[in-house]
Amino acid sequence: VCTGRRAFTESLALDKAGVSTERGVVLTDGNFRTNVENIWAIGDCVGGMMLAHNAAAQGEYVADLIAGRHNGVNLKVVPSCIYTVPEIAAVGLTEQKATEAGYEVSVGKFPLGANGKSLIAGRERGFVKLVFDKKTQKLLGATLYCDRATDMIGELALALANGMGK
């Protein structure tokens, strides 16, 4: 069961500062600026992927913007995960999103039932799916639905961030 999360902003007195919210979520632009000058928001209070590693990447991004630097943090390669059994982890574009973005995609999907280690461990339920740009052969995204998916997604995020492919 996944129950989801919600932003907990009630105690921040955002209304007194004039910061716009919607259903408890702080509204920001593409660079985490709120509608009030010099007030930025990151992490769970802005909704989206509510995970510590995502908030840390957002914090690094915003700190550099405030300091007048552009650090090149690519928030599109920050993985997401769901701690279910089996786990779900993803990074980059799904097949559908890649197609909608105009890519001609090629997809590789590997069922865990065909993996010896998974069979021995009795954890053959699941798959690994990789989405590539058919023209350049570069990785566009990955989805893992398997035991320890959240432990393995980092390597695929690294490959995606570095423009690696087949």
Kindly give the residue locations of the regions a language model identified.
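Small-molecule pocket liners
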Residues: 24, 79-80, 128
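Short amphipathic alpha-helical segments
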Residues: 38, 78-79, 140
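Solvent-exposed alpha-helices and their adjacent loops that cap or buttress functional pockets
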Residues: 33-34, 38, 74-75, 120-122
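Proline- and acidic/polar-enriched loop/turn elements at helix boundaries
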Residues: 26, 78, 110-111
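FAD-site-proximal beta/loop scaffold in flavoenzymes
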Residues: 1-66
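Flexible, glycine-rich terminal cap/loop adjacent to redox cofactors
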Residues: 83-166
